């Protein structure tokens, strides 16, 4: 029987501090100028500084809450293990984790449009615009104007994470053979992230969803066999294998463009960490296919006096089956290829061979 309880913490990630300094109201100003604009610089001249009293369009900023605290998590674990005979043991372990983490919130977010109204309005044309940016700006707490701000993302302590999982494992050992199997059933969710604000900052809880690493089912088996034999040719061989089968990662289904006038358009961030774009059902509601692969290893030791030579051959993804990553699925509602996979770099490597020879002295 075993168990534990503890609080774990970490220091502020430096890039979030840099964001607050560079992307804040007194940080960098990004603007676009046409080549006909009087302020457009001519090589080798550089863009001059803004003159006193210059009027700038409303911009978006990222700042840090003055009461920001370190991220931390409370973790509880409990497990039991039992020996069955002299060669087999079984174990059950449970783990619960509750975390408090950083998360951006847009303190000047427009009034959200309810999901049922959004989906009904876009049912016939998923690429339609049901509210312009100007109309959305009218619903912001602070109206964007000259020298003002549109998005006011503030890094807060409102982020949360939840994890609970149970792992079942068995180990069987004999003189030539060792076999292990482990199955984990788990659930991992989080809310907000320290990269960008969510789809609806006025209701942070609506961002709660599976984490990008959520793996409800995870089965790993392995075996290692010392092949019987003796002599220079038949002795010293070992064959081992590992099989892995797990749930595919989640991903978010979203609408293209900016149907509600949020102001980010096609540049809206949307990945496994979070989603600023408009979604029909929320974050990480779809899931990729199961990931399955098997690796095989064969090795032999040769004794050379007091020294040893080790030969090893590895085959990764023995069955050469295709494993599709969640980031490759086309997730735009209305896209003719919606739900299909793009392949390419979003596919785990196919079968690979590796050979090694080691001399130990």
Q: What label would you give each PLM region?
A:
Residues 1, 86-88, 175-177, 217-219, ...:
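Outer-envelope beta-barrel architecture signal
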Residues 1-155, 267-276, 281-285, 289:
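Solvent-exposed loop/turn elements at secondary-structure boundaries
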Residues 3, 80, 92, 170, ...:
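Membrane-embedded beta-strand positions of outer-membrane beta-barrel proteins
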Residues 7, 82, 172-174, 225-227, ...:
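Residue-level signature of outer-membrane beta-barrel architecture
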Residues 49, 230-305, 310, 316:
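Extracytoplasmic gating/loop element in the C-terminal half of outer-membrane beta-barrel translocons
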Residues 64, 74-78, 164-168, 217-223, ...:
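Hydrophobic, lipid-facing positions within transmembrane beta-strands of outer-membrane proteins
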Residues 95-232, 238-246:
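Gram-negative outer-membrane beta-barrel transporters
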Residues 287, 323-361:
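C-terminal beta-signal and terminal closure region of outer-membrane beta-barrel proteins
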């Amino acid at each position: 029987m075993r168990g534990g309880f503890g609080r774990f913490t970490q220091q502020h990630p430096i890039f979030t501090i840099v964001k607050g300094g560079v992307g804040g109201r007194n940080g960098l100003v990004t603007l676009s100028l046409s080549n006909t604009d009087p302020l457009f610089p001519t090589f080798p001249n550089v863009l001059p500084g803004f003159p006193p009293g210059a009027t700038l369009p409303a911009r978006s900023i990222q700042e840090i809450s003055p009461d920001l605290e370190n991220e931390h998590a409370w973790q509880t674990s409990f497990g039991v293990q039992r020996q069955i005979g002299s060669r087999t043991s079984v174990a059950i372990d449970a783990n619960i984790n509750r975390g408090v983490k950083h998360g951006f919130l847009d303190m000047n977010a427009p009034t959200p449009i309810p999901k049922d109204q959004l989906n009904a309005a876009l049912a016939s044309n998923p690429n339609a615009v049901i509210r312009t940016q100007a109309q959305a700006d009218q619903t912001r707490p602070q109206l964007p104007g000259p020298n003002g701000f549109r998005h006011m993302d503030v890094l807060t302590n409102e982020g949360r994470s939840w994890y609970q999982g149970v792992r079942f494992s068995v180990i069987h050992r004999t003189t030539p053979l060792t076999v292990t199997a482990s199955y984990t059933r788990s659930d991992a969710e989080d809310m907000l992230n320290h990269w960008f604000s969510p789809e609806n900052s006025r209701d942070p809880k609506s961002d709660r969803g599976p984490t990008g690493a959520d793996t409800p089912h995870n089965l790993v088996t392995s075996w290692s066999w010392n092949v019987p034999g003796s002599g220079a040719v038949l002795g010293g061989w070992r064959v081992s294998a590992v099989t892995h089968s797990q749930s595919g990662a989640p991903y978010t289904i979203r609408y293209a463009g900016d149907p509600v006038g949020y102001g980010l358009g096609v540049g809206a961030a949307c990945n496994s960490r979070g989603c600023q774009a408009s979604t029909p059902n929320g974050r990480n509601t779809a899931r990729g296919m199961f990931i399955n692969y098997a690796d095989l290893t064969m090795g032999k030791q040769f004794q050379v006096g007091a020294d040893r030579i080790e030969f090893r051959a590895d085959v990764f993804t023995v069955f050469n089956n295709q494993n599709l990553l969640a980031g490759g699925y086309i997730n735009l509602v209305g896209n003719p290829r919606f739900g299909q996979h793009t392949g390419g770099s979003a596919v785990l490597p196919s079968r690979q061979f590796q050979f090694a020879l080691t001399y130990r002295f």
